[in-house]
Amino acid sequence: MKLSKIALEAEANALAALFNGGFMDYFDGTQPPSADFSVSTQTLGVTLVFGNPAFKPAVGGVLTANALITGVVTREIKVAWARCYKADHQTALVDLTVGVADSADIIMPTTHLVPGLQVPVSRFSFSIQNWKGPLT
């Protein structure tokens, strides 16, 4: 299956709407296998808030976030991953890796977060890939 540009952008924009007024929480510890698994022993260090709308309209299946509200660290942690939620702050949407290397989904100058530190997001974007897998 190869989606048209209009179908790809409609898919991306539908996903983007789920983030409106949502949250991005930064945690320490082991990242769960997927966003369908509950947070258990991981410690929350900081929460950022998505705007409403959270993203600009998709272009070529690429979503670029509008400004997020900067979070202030509440607990000292070594951040390892983040989870994004809908506006209810209950419904998980996506988990992201956090690190100092380009291989991380979220790149930070340091993963050591201390109380009072402000955590901004300078840019947040991702691409909805045009699925080309085999049909069975």
PLM region spans:
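Small cysteine-rich, disulfide-bonded extracellular modules of the LU/uPAR three-finger superfamily
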Residues: 1-82, 87-136
